[in-house]
Amino acid sequence: MYAVLKSFGLRGLNGFPVEVEADISGGMPALSIVGLPDSAVRESGDRVHAALKNLGFKWPDRRITINLAPADVRKTGPVYDLPLLLAVLAASGQLETPPKDTAFLGELALDGSLRPVSGVLPMALEAAASGVRALYVPAENAAEAAEAGGSEMQVFPAATARQVVDALRGVQPIPPTAPVPFDPADAWNHVPDFSDVCSQPLARRAMVIAAAGGHNVLLIGAPGTGKSMLARRLPGILPPLSREEAVETTKIYSIAGQMPAGRGLVTARPFRSPHHSASSAALAGGGALFRPGECSLANCGVLFLDELPEFSRESLEVLRQPLEDGCITVSRAAGSATYPSRFQLVAAMNPCKCGYYGHPTRACTCSPSAVRQYRSRVSGPLLDRIDLCVEMDPVAFDELHSVSPSESSAELRRQVLAARAIQAQRYAAPGYEGVHCNAQLTAGQVRRICRMTPAAEQLLRASYETLGLSARAHDRILRVARTVADLAGKRLLDEDSLLEALQYRAQEKVELTF
């Protein structure tokens, strides 16, 4: 006898349909799984066998052949356990073959209970696009899968395979799961507040500019000056995630297996802070299953690299593609996968190896050549992709004990949202597709958008020739100046906007001369 069920697999960031075919024929009792299965899929036969018996069903004592189509695409993971069990039941006559518009996902425990699987949201989105009307998933994945449902597709949560069988037989229907209400603004309540940061007005201003324009930031300062505090508070003044951004971010976290059980969409902008010992593969992603790395996990959020020069040169060079293109391609012998990596980079570093070069009270123990060598670990091409650089001085005692309140995240966020509203209106015009903030402007768009007063243009010309700026640095200065002007509500870039943008140039602050 023969039966076919519908399931889905993962290829990069997207799902693809998989037909689970089961054929039971005469011959010696055996189970064969074909269709390019990996070891986890091949092992599913043993899980299905044990679960089926423990649920009280009969295992067919005949030859069973399972085919996962299309046969030329590799199948990975335990997501096919549930459809395999149902296909065996249908082919052996213990269950009617489910309708063609019904699909199944889920890993089996040996007692027949269902365990959550990774990548449910991209597979559920593909299911809805493929015309599936009913999707059965493990109960812990239901909230995530329901985000792809709506009126066209219902998502049914199940704790055991027995519940799925009873629902298909009409014995005990399963109530469908409704999507969780989307409330990204609530995420602000779980981020530390900027009012905790004492003094550092220049660095605070740089973080506001970064949030308003989507710019990358480098913080340079001795230990204890507040670099990490500022970085961890940046998500609290960023605009809330749009639903489109939330879906994209949730897909990445789901594929990486980092979605908490029972969660719908990710509502908070990610904040990722990998250790400086992280390898290039940890940042870029990879492995046999093409898992996303830290660059992709920080998509639509903040990637914080503390102790920047301590990262290996190979790891830092990985950042160049996502910083420029907003995506990263992971290539292996089995193929390649491209993941979105549109993050804001916030990097922090000490001024030297000992951390006290230029400190007003503590002596630096590094020689000039040691300072130069330490800072040279950050390459020029990477610095050229950082829009804002701030040197942070130690906090004075009086500032630490000042009773004057610092601006809160809510106050800074109002400034950021006002500037983002100006940009949203500006980039709603034709010709700016995919541009949401000033940092995303192309070179051609910079020329059209960043109009200057005559005095500002003369200042930029003098700076370009004196500082020996590259074309990329020229455009980044204009993007920052455009953000400064947006924060001030100015239509044209004036001298003040350009001067503030120029003072944040990273190249000159990192490359010391003695």
Residue ranges of predicted features:
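Catalytic P-loop NTPase motifs of RecA-like helicase/translocase cores
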Residues: D111, L305-S312, G355
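Walker A/P-loop
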Residues: L219-P260
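Peripheral, non-AAA+ core regions of ATP-driven protein-machinery
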Residues: M1-L218, A222, S228, S331, ...
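Conserved inter-motif catalytic segment of the P-loop NTP-binding fold
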Residues: E245-S279, G286-G287, D393, G434-G444, ...
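Conserved alpha-helical scaffold flanking the Walker A/P-loop in AAA+ ATPase domains
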Residues: V208, L265, P270, S280-L303, ...
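Basic, amphipathic alpha-helical bundle interface domains used for macromolecular binding and assembly
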Residues: V34-G45, P60, N67-G77, L289-F290, ...
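Walker B catalytic acidic pair
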Residues: C300, D306-E307, V318
